Amino acid sequence: MSTPFYVSPEQIMKDRAEFARKGIARGRSNVVLQYADGILFVAENTSKALHKISEVYDRIAFAAVGRYNEFENLRVAGVRLADLTGYTYDRRDVTGRTIANAYAQTLGAIFSGATEKPYEVEIVVAEVGDTPDGDSMYRLTYDGSVAEEHGYVAMGGQAEQITAQLKDRYVENLPLGEALRLAVDVLSRASDGGEPRTLTPDQLEVAALDRTRGRRAFRRFIGAQLQELLRPTS
């Protein structure tokens, strides 16, 4: 009788982590950063039907990279949790931290489980406050780990390159247009070959949580409005 093949738990977790990281690295990058009036989301995305950035609740939004069907399942679950909590208790009880913790539990359970593959996703949950000090951004990885970020966060295959550029160039309280142009510029410079590219409005998905809009803070930028924001000021 042959001896059963043995793989240590440590090796299994290592292999699952490597599998998830490779899947995420194939995705185009996203940038989330704070600006003067809120939180800006910029994704390289040529699809008009499949969103990588979405509203979750009044002042909470979601950005993701990786497998669309997997992060879309998480987005829908987050929206349902937010709606149920707001309806059962109070809208003020729905927070970005609540949504992020729920996602962390789901991702952690899937990553540790033996019956299905880990999710190939990375997520940012952001909530805009009444002031910049009240803003919050939570980054979640494939294994359910959560990190609270400040200022900016990059996800996707070129996240390290983008983060290094933002570390040198980002400043607090940028106007919306300047923040958007910075995000697009660092995305355009992040490539395997190191050569900067030209990203047109048709290749971008852009949205923001704007604290000046009241309860429904989420807004998208498309068409002429996006082109105007991308135009350099003289």
Curated annotation (Swiss-Prot):
CDD domains: proteasome_protease_HslV (cd01906). One of its GO terms (cellular component) is proteasome core complex, alpha-subunit complex. Keywords: Cytoplasm, Proteasome. GO terms for molecular function: threonine-type endopeptidase activity. The keyword Cytoplasm applies. Pathway: Protein degradation; proteasomal Pup-dependent pathway. Pfam families: Proteasome (PF00227). It comes from the Bacteria. The formation of the proteasomal ATPase ARC-20S proteasome complex, likely via the docking of the C-termini of ARC into the intersubunit pockets in the alpha-rings, may trigger opening of the gate for substrate entry. Interconversion between the open-gate and close-gate conformations leads to a dynamic regulation of the 20S proteasome proteolysis activity. Its main location: cytoplasm. Transmembrane segments: none annotated. GO terms for biological process: modification-dependent protein catabolic process; proteasomal protein catabolic process. It is found in: Cytoplasm. InterPro entries: Ntn_hydrolases_N, Proteasome_alpha-type, Proteasome_asu_bac, Proteasome_sua/b. Component of the proteasome core, a large protease complex with broad specificity involved in protein degradation. The 20S proteasome core is composed of 14 alpha and 14 beta subunits that assemble into four stacked heptameric rings, resulting in a barrel-shaped structure. The two inner rings, each composed of seven catalytic beta subunits, are sandwiched by two outer rings, each composed of seven alpha subunits. The catalytic chamber with the active sites is on the inside of the barrel. Has a gated structure, the ends of the cylinder being occluded by the N-termini of the alpha-subunits. Is capped by the proteasome-associated ATPase, ARC. Belongs to the peptidase T1A family. This is Proteasome subunit alpha.
